[in-house]
């Protein structure tokens, strides 16, 4: 996180999607929620943790992150998982519960399949041309970056490893979380179907809410991300 955490207010710990890092959540710093602290998390292999080896499974990465955050997990807090980040969040919350910590007030899953549903097409196995075409459809990456061979030679291995971790992850014995879950998905998401996202309701013994966005890609534009998360937080704290 790179900075001291505030003592009061709701902490929203933000877990990024495949290939991304804490920076994708920086637009949330502009949210007009005075009692909310945005806590973007950086993962191994990127940003300030670029020197760290990327774990080769979702559970292994979740274990590492859960232990990193252990000193900071106390009420009130919430988790925002963006795509891959939602799988990490599910695993991390279970670990904190096993270690005797309180659950979050809310678990927000954004553009994410639930842990007991298969990933679908294996993007990590695609050849270079097909893989980059798939990335273009997901949104979030400018065409200039996709066409820059030097940049992609560094970025593509990270993305493929993240996708492979997601593709290989599937929970067989689903354990419901006690906290509410709010799932957000776009009807134009190239990776997901709404019926799959609805299955997040199986992951909680608490309340479940589904929000469907219209016409947005898998990686949301910053303004849409800000608006949808502000709405979720205001609903939770009302």
Task: List the model feature ranges, each with a label.
Residues 1-238:
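Non-catalytic, mobile gating and regulatory segments of ester bond hydrolases
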